[in-house]
Amino acid sequence: MAKSSFFNKHLLLSLLILLQSCLLSSSSSTDSETLLNFKLTADSTGKLNSWNTTTNPCQWTGVSCNRNRVTRLVLEDINLTGSISSLTSLTSLRVLSLKHNNLSGPIPNLSNLTALKLLFLSNNQFSGNFPTSITSLTRLYRLDLSFNNFSGQIPPDLTDLTHLLTLRLESNRFSGQIPNINLSDLQDFNVSGNNFNGQIPNSLSQFPESVFTQNPSLCGAPLLKCTKLSSDPTKPGRPDEAKASPLNKPETVPSSPTSIHGGDKSNNTSRISTISLIAIILGDFIILSFVSLLLYYCFWRQYAVNKKKHSKILEGEKIVYSSNPYPTSTQNNNNQNQQVGDKGKMVFFEGTRRFELEDLLRASAEMLGKGGFGTAYKAVLEDGNEVAVKRLKDAVTVAGKKEFEQQMEVLGRLRHTNLVSLKAYYFAREEKLLVYDYMPNGSLFWLLHGNRGPGRTPLDWTTRLKIAAGAARGLAFIHGSCKTLKLTHGDIKSTNVLLDRSGNARVSDFGLSIFAPSQTVAKSNGYRAPELIDGRKHTQKSDVYSFGVLLLEILTGKCPNMVETGHSGGAVDLPRWVQSVVREEWTAEVFDLELMRYKDIEEEMVGLLQIAMACTAVAADHRPKMGHVVKLIEDIRGGGSEASPCNDGINSAVDSPCLSEDTCGGTTSQ
């Protein structure tokens, strides 16, 4: 009887596996047919010859799959034509990029593509109204419909796309008023070159002027102030105000300024002699000239006082709004820029909400802390916008103007939900400022080590694991963003992992280590890879080591450079202490006592400990790449991360639409 029961269970399990396999095969076959139908109508030049029935569709040009379903379709600049209606059957699609083609017609109903995160359809011939089905794609992070022939109004339901980071609608024929798109995460926004009218909503008014230009009837900040011409005849300011007043009947309204005194007196002016008229005019002219000179003298004197008072603040101030979409001041007009650069200028990256340098100087400031690269401040601007400003005056001693600007161009291009993105920078001979988004929930260091008194709320395991995964994704994105330069962070530590309003980890201060004096690096000994002790340069492998130390800090609750050995009372670095404890088979002694209150997490903690020990291998070649570390951590968490808009292809970020074109920018010293 037992054998029969076992046989039945085994048979049922086999049937379920077979059914699942059939379903996956059927779905894969459906995706294959969908792509072949699209090829028949769109590929008139034969660029998709690899798409045929004899090969696996997951190996076709521009196609990526997950579990035999098409999840990514990137077909850019290959002269595709026709409609994209057939693609709506690709229900597992996460990334769709068809920019720089000749596709046309209206956008079909995309509501079936519920997994879509990135949609790039720019530089085509699409037409019709804004595709309202897009507003139902609640996982969407980036939407680019620019340089097409769309028309009509923008639906206010765009506010339902709460994760949206990019909204590019420039160079179309959209009209009507811009809706109040109040999306807190929106970073990259442009509606220039359309037919919008009315006032710019307050929620968008701090984006640069360039993103609203070429809309003749658009007004309000940052464009010209709207002038309200009321059609209400009772409103003041109209030339025919007397007609409009309810106190005047139409028949009593004067037709000329003098007729109110009667018709006879209007002829008296003709009796005034010519000499008297000239005398009156000369007298008025002399009086007006005297008053004008007096006012000019008073105002000029006040202006001179103010100019002298504020000359140090205002001298050489110049705000540059970058295009393309990043600053290119180091590439053109070298002589002019050198002159401006000596005095100082502020450069904003496109999509950043603008403000004047004076606004920053007037803002209420709160010091957040001092680090190896300078002092960080929280600045609250007059409009309530909060930014973080890092002052590098004392730290950046080895970088020249050209080297500094080239590095800023590269760093300013990096955009990811797990990075604290660089918004703007100011460069002058005596002052260097970096402007970032303000992260209100502090740093990982403070959450782990701050206020360990009795009233403290400990950091639970789920939150620690989420922070570890987010920081890993951010660092992996930096490493994969530009293969030719092999970018590094250079200073991974818990104070450089910040938390945004949603509790997501964001890596900060990346790419600044090349400017730091050697003594600054020495202060991060607890995180420093062994190979850096003899003065070698930072590498991606040394970043991996530092990240491994960070994981050990999360697991143990101990500061990396403050671990006591227990017998001698001396201190030892955290990786060596963990290795010694594990070697003596006291693994449970490694973990933070605050984690012991949680049940059924020991297996996950041991798994993360193994990752940390692999990252802190003494030999750099034995350490894993960050892309692999991300996968290992996500496996512990129990699946892929839906929170990251750039999770697809994290090891090939250069080819990912998560990045703008030419991520590497110009050459830079690294």
Swiss-Prot record:
UniProt-listed Gene3D superfamilies: Phosphorylase Kinase, domain 1, Ribonuclease Inhibitor, Transferase(Phosphotransferase) domain 1
Segments on the Cytoplasmic side according to the record's topology features: 296-670
Signal peptide extent: 1-29
EC primary class: transferase
Record's bilayer topology term: Single-pass type I membrane protein
Glycosylation site positions: 52, 79, 102, 109, 112, 149, 182, 190, 268
Location of the Protein kinase domain: 362-636
Reactions accelerated catalytically: L-seryl-[protein] + ATP = O-phospho-L-seryl-[protein] + ADP + H(+); L-threonyl-[protein] + ATP = O-phospho-L-threonyl-[protein] + ADP + H(+)
UniProt repeat feature LRR, residue ranges: 69-91, 92-114, 115-137, 139-162, 163-185, 186-207
GO cellular component: plasma membrane
InterPro entries with a match to the protein in the record: Kinase-like_dom_sf (IPR011009), Leu-rich_rpt (IPR001611), LRR_dom_sf (IPR032675), LRR_N_plant-typ (IPR013210), PRK1-6/SRF4-like (IPR046959), Prot_kinase_dom (IPR000719), Protein_kinase_ATP_BS (IPR017441), Ser/Thr_kinase_AS (IPR008271)
EC id: 2.7.11.1
SUPFAM superfamilies linked: L domain-like (SSF52058), Protein kinase-like (PK-like) (SSF56112)
CDD domains: STKc_IRAK
Active-site positions on this chain: 491 (proton acceptor)
Top-level taxon of origin: Eukaryota
Phosphoserine: modified positions: 364, 443
Family: Belongs to the protein kinase superfamily. Ser/Thr protein kinase family.
Protein name stated in the entry: Probable leucine-rich repeat receptor-like protein kinase At1g68400
